Amino acid sequence: MAFKIASSPHVTRNLHTSTVMQRVILCLLPGLVVQCAFFGWGTLVQVLLAILVALSCEAAVMKLRNRNIKASLSDNSAMLTAILIGVAIPPLAPWWMIVMGTAFAIVIVKHLYGGLGHNLFNPAMAAYVLLLVSFPVQMTTWIAPSTVALHSPSLVESLQLIFNVGAHVNMEQFRLGIDGMTMATPLDTLKTDLSMGLTTTESLTKAIFDGSTGVGWFWVNLAYLAGGLVLLKLKAIRWHISTGVLLGLFVASSIGFLLSPDTQASPLMHLFSGATMLAAFFIATDPVTAATSSRGRIIFGALIGVLVYIIRTKGGYPDAFAFAVLLANLCAPFIDYYVRPRTYGHSTS
């Protein structure tokens, strides 16, 4: 056995919860900036509104529980949950949806089970699923990316649509591409086209696609990937879950694409469309709701990746990370039970 020799002092520094959350939030910023660049001010408005609601709900619940409000707010967990919800929903969704989703995430999913460290499910993804199931039309109404949009909303127009003021502003005018066609997300467009009998190659000729990836979404995912790599460098997360998610999705989509390239999206499109990189580095890596052992984390991540591919190709929703993460959260105790590290000094038999 080889032993690594290092000079003193042998001092390690423990990261506090607030520090970890701060690092995650900072690493989210590149993706948020790029997302705002392609989809307008609405994303930033949703994030700020979600933060306001999350902090208010956190303080109210702490007050009811006779807990330290300042300590709870300063751990930044509520703010991180709010940001994840804000970037996940369409930028021009009505204000009451982000309020409802954020309040549900903080009050019900997080605190009903005991607060930080005790929740069974990822709060942001549970809130997303609640909104998606309850309001499917609003949750799947994305505007066209700025590079191919016929009209891009200004800050004032975004506020008017989100808060439903100003009768002259219409959502549909911001969903039109430069070809005059109403646009959806790349995954939604491809799924609709395949159901109508078009091939993948024929679908990729539309303006929403740029080669084998979606316009705008490739750069959004690339920005979240960059932030995720920095997060790994800072040791705020471990590599196992992210690697498992990306490998699981890549292997499953590669098999599907090799078997039927005319009816399946390429692995590159799966990896750089939708919420892939956001989920792989910032959502699935939630230590509270994930598996605990190193091997268990890889299995946990791979399960998410495979579930995403199955739901994207066979399910009713074009993107599937919220459902995949929640299903994997359910499986985390099962994974921990059967994938336990061997105790030092004990045999495996």
From Swiss-Prot:
Domain of life: Bacteria
Cofactor: FMN
Modification type FMN phosphoryl threonine: residues: T185
Recorded coiled-coil stretches: none
Principal location listed in the UniProt entry: membrane
This enzyme's EC code(s): 7.-.-.-
UniProt subunit comment: The complex is composed of six subunits: RnfA, RnfB, RnfC, RnfD, RnfE and RnfG.
Protein name stated in the entry: Ion-translocating oxidoreductase complex subunit D
Organism in which the protein naturally occurs: Shewanella baltica (strain OS223)
Name of the gene: rnfD
